[in-house]
């Protein structure tokens, strides 16, 4: 064949040669033929060297092309995402993906049809592999949307959320149809089908889109976020019902419409009456806590594909099949969470951006010029842009008015309305489906895409401008131990992550309880990571009997343990148990909200490290718990304590032993808070308190500043007793002073007394900028414990004594 020269070949031979070489070609009669299975990869540089002009470049083969598109899209959308973060803009990830696809569209337009970039991105007369993969990713996105959605929350939603959700959908639709009917048929630039599609899609609020927006903005655990999620859930369900109802109305005949509705009903019956019970049987057979096998995951994915095929045969929106199947899958562990964990990260980061790129590449950007200058443009573009703007304003208005009538602050009502007016990938996909059915024209589709891109960029920026997360937990009162009356009620919030935290928290509560004259109220919060769901949940077990409700299956051990403690140990302590099912990165919001709502004085958190039973080795080190503790310290509306539990005597179980407590006091508000807590413990019969004050060697003890004066006031009683040579038997309190040269002296002193106590209580900032920590502050591993607290909790400390690190309430807002 002359070294690859095929110019002399007849069309028939040339076609056979090309087909044999790279698997697809245009046949001599003009038909496009492919060899199955097709040749996916290039043979490299040899292809061009052997057959020269007949050979393909490596990017023209399907697998290399797919790899190039995936990498190109991934780096572009990640680049936009990083850029927005650097600029401090609150732009969701889906918006970055849209911009990546839009940029590629512009590059293809500018480079021309024959450029390399167009050859890679634009598929002519061949299967669009990247687009097909993106479409599959979009089906998975819809399926996971259904899995994450908890429809039962509609019945638990506040009236404010329910009314807002319904009004946000129905009001724009009603007004839109009234305006459409007021115009004569001759003066309507849009067809009824176009108007119908736009009116419905612009009025609906997508739950998954709002959940993703709030997650990206870090608002899904805020009070506004919770109302928005409930409202969006109601709105989404109402919108889906309207879509299904629209099927019969848009059918050619009433019989056709009823037939389609019957087939949809059959699908729903199979999903909820057959598939869902099977899933529950699988869960029951596998047992709680055991992982789901891969074969079940694969089986569910097959059902997703079959569901979409069924809905496509009905000429309906195929992803709805995946969505309703997802609703039938039990959310949360083990199946729902396993599906989300296995599929979501890869699908959202890699595959779904391909779908958005494919949508953007189908957009005609030249149509935007007429839309942006629609006052002087044609009537149709003016009508499309006007309708989008009108529905947006109607939706925004009603979403502000309804919550405001329910006594929500105006600023919060505006933020909620902006959230409810957000548009994204769901609306984009419906418009693409409408374009494929020729319900809308290419120009109309392009203008609608532009409106969604602008909406997805501007709405989050407006929300970020109005929403100030630092004001979420503003407290207008002092909520700390130092400002409490001696016999005042102590309200604590105890946080539990795992069963091994229960006993240590109970022992500490028992030690800090004085008497019925000085009441103790304890709120117990069991923290459970949100898996396989979108909506965080806070369950109060005071209003929910054991065995009823989803929260009890997670918290049964916690509830029973504290009920036993309440009945058999301290019946006069008031205990209220909660379960918080939330995203690990935002649990601090739920802790602080509960502390603020219940007027808590002290939050007690477990340390992120857990020791073995003999207290000699570390068995777990969970960074997520440490991250949570650090964030609670930053934004708590009250004082916070971190308990490093290694050995804490239970006085009821060991009545012959006393609990020996030592406070390391250097000075400052955190040390005063630690002393106030320890003084409360010292009023117990079996508690012995030692207060060790560390003084800088050679410096005067006289108060020279406000902090020092406050320290002196707190220690006055103890100093007086010590100077008189007394130890008060009724309080069993000892006061000691020790002069320290530097951190080495402090280290030696603490090591010498390591085995004398059961519990050390220190302030978080104990010894900060003081001679007591000079030389050892650089060795601090955990900043949340402070220098002294970190030293006492370190594995190098000789004894395995428990440590409580206390931070006083940081800020109290001015009433003005």
UniProtKB/Swiss-Prot annotation:
Protein localization: Membrane
UniProt keyword list: Antiport, Ion transport, Membrane, Potassium, Potassium transport, Transmembrane, Transmembrane helix, Transport
Signal sequence region: none
InterPro entries hit by this protein: Cation/H_exchanger_TM, CPA2_transporter, Na+/solute_symporter_sf
One record GO biological process: proton transmembrane transport
A Gene Ontology term for the protein's cellular component: membrane
GO molecular function ontology, one term from the record: antiporter activity
Pfam families per UniProt: CHX17_2nd, CHX17_C, Na_H_Exchanger
Domain of life: Eukaryota
Transmembrane segments: 64-84, 97-117, 127-147, 163-183, 197-214, 227-247, 255-275, 297-317, 343-363, 382-402, 413-433, 447-467
Tissue specificity note: Specifically expressed in pollen.
Membrane-topology descriptor: Multi-pass membrane protein
Main location: membrane
Entry function: May operate as a cation/H(+) antiporter.
Family under the similarity heading: Belongs to the monovalent cation:proton antiporter 2 (CPA2) transporter (TC 2.A.37) family. CHX (TC 2.A.37.4) subfamily.
PANTHER family referenced in this protein's UniProt entry, alphabetically: CATION/H + ANTIPORTER (PTHR32468), CATION_H(+) ANTIPORTER 5-RELATED (PTHR32468:SF93)
The name this protein goes by in its record: Cation/H(+) antiporter 8
Source species of the chain: Arabidopsis thaliana
